[in-house]
Amino acid sequence: MQYRHTFHVHAPLAVVSDFHAHSASMGAITPPPVIAQIHQAPVRLQEGDEMDFTLWLGPLPIRWVARIEHVGLNGFTDRQLRGPFRRWVHRHSFRPINETTTAVIDEIEAELHRHLFWAVVGLGMWLNMPLLFAYRGWKTRSLLEKSSAQPEFSSAKLKDNP
């Protein structure tokens, strides 16, 4: 299965890249009622880092471990090591449109688990991808466009803007 979503944010490439490099950005752009509980992750994501987190879908905890790969100014990839899919590779790409606008492109390749329970959970998650990424685009724009004059984001600032 493949999914692609693109949106533009009125913020420079460096600001968009820096925002996504903070592990706290995941929780900041996760739509309610889903809760992203991060168990272990560095403050700033770098090549080879792992994120261990739980996505709470109501009362259902979905534990996930992802490795961060191909990190650079223009994006990074998170690859599921353990989680609800048999295979999940998510490429986050950032492309400058001009000095003040950046395209954010999410490309996901996934395979459902063979186990019936996890296949149903994964399929439910997959079918909600358009809603998830519409929210993420809106929230990213909301956070970055009001703060794009600020050259750097901190985890504290991200936590202050749930």
How should each PLM-predicted stretch be described?
Residues 2-4, 61-65, 87-91:
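Short, surface-exposed coil-to-beta transition loops
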Residues 80-131:
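Beta-strand/loop substructures that line and gate deep hydrophobic ligand-binding cavities in soluble
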